[in-house]
Amino acid sequence: MRPAFITCVILLLFSSTETFAEDFEKTEYKADSARTLQYALLEPQKVEAGKKYPLLLSLHGAGGRGNKNWERNCLANKILSGREMRSQYPCFILAPTVSKQGSWKSESMDDVLELVEKLLKKLPIDPDRVYVTGQSMGGGGTYEAMARKPELFAAGVPVCGGNKVENAKKIAAIPIWAFHGEKDRVVHVERGREMIEAIKKAGGKPRYSELPGVRHNSWTPAYKNQEMWKWLFSQKRTKTKSS
């Protein structure tokens, strides 16, 4: 009996952490530009009639480029697709991807934002609760998405990402909680600091968590931070933010 019990426990643990990918529906979007954008979409476990849900735009890092399992490259997807989290924070998760040589600072971001607008019309999404997050290249993409369409987002969580400080003025009104590892040598921590300081100078009030001793993998403590998720899903777009 003991081996059978152990096997059941292992299977339960495996299913709770690995089957999340099966719940993401992978498809593609033909943009107005005629470009094709591949993406994965996770819906709430139960969509109730007449109710609207948040949408989280989740951007992968460079390791997800040209990867057939790109949705696994952002830890946020795995965390939020767990049973308890899906129950606590029912939402739509949009996880697009770029080509092997692509970037979130390219025309691909225009296609992503166009897709978000289409989904807002098609699905029961609360337009005042559209969020964006991403790690590494996706962290930079988080800043980029907010800068290109600041009126769209209620909040953003860039993780170990940087962007042009010139964009700070565009996103200063958006609630932001950024994370960066103190010892990051891939996307140097100075880039994160510079962006936060620029946002503050532009009148913003971003939250910034610099993680002592942490290198590039700051997404692990960031996305396992329950306070962050509680904060993110409590944010709502206001007239001031969308003006």
Named regions from a protein language model:
Residues 45-51, 100-137:
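Gly/Ser-rich "nucleophile elbow"/oxyanion-hole loop immediately N-terminal to the catalytic nucleophile
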Residues 171, 177-180, 184:
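Short beta-strand/loop motif that positions the catalytic acidic residue
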Residues 117, 121-122, 128-172:
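Primarily recognizes the serine-hydrolase "nucleophile elbow" in alpha/beta-hydrolase
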Residues 55, 59-113:
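Active-site machinery of serine-nucleophile hydrolases
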Residues 71-72, 188-198:
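Short alpha-helix in the alpha/beta-hydrolase fold that links the catalytic acid
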Residues 214-222:
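Catalytic histidine-centered segment of alpha/beta-hydrolase-like enzymes
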Residues 17-55, 133-135, 140, 145-148, ...:
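A domain-start/cap signature at the N-terminus of enzymes
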Residues 183-188, 217-218:
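Acidic catalytic loop of the alpha/beta-hydrolase fold
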